[in-house]
A protein has these predicted regions:
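Hydrophobic h-region of N-terminal signal peptides that target proteins for export
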Residues: 8-18
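Aromatic- and Gly/Pro-enriched helix-to-coil junctions and flexible linker segments
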Residues: 16-128
Length: 128
């Protein structure tokens, strides 16, 4: 019986520990990351629920942003900004607007992320 109680405690503690980083990520997403992406990305990627998000990529929630769109892989690859399409395409938008994968596209009315914003996004993705 003691083993069962100990096992139950370990499972509960493990579940809590696994949720703690997710809760911290969600809080950071809502407070810091989404507000800076909203101006550059949300117009095409989910702000208007009546319109389909371009490329099937919706950034309105952390879960949907991490999942990615119909193409190009995961939006966020935790621990690796270089493999995260959200970061890669945003970086292209800030450094090479002529690249066809740059986000926002050159013809868009929205401004790309700044270098400081890119650094915040990179740190967010790479945080453990």
């Amino acid at each position: 019986m003691r083993h069962l109680a100990l096992l139950s405690l370990l499972v509960t503690a493990s579940a809590y520990a696994a949720d703690a980083p997710n809760a911290a990520r969600e809080k950071a997403w809502k407070a810091d990351i989404f507000p800076m992406l909203e101006n550059s990305c949300a117009g095409c990627h989910g702000k208007d629920p009546a319109k389909k998000a371009k490329g099937g990529y919706n950034i309105m929630t952390l879960e949907s942003a991490a999942k990615g769109g119909k193409e190009n892989g995961d939006g966020i690859t935790w621990g690796n900004a270089a493999k995260s399409t959200l970061y890669k395409f945003s970086e292209l938008g800030a450094t090479n607007r002529d690249d066809e994968m740059a986000m926002p596209p050159k013809k868009a009315k929205s401004e790309p992320l700044t270098k400081d914003q890119l650094a915040k996004l990179k740190a967010f993705i790479e945080a453990k």
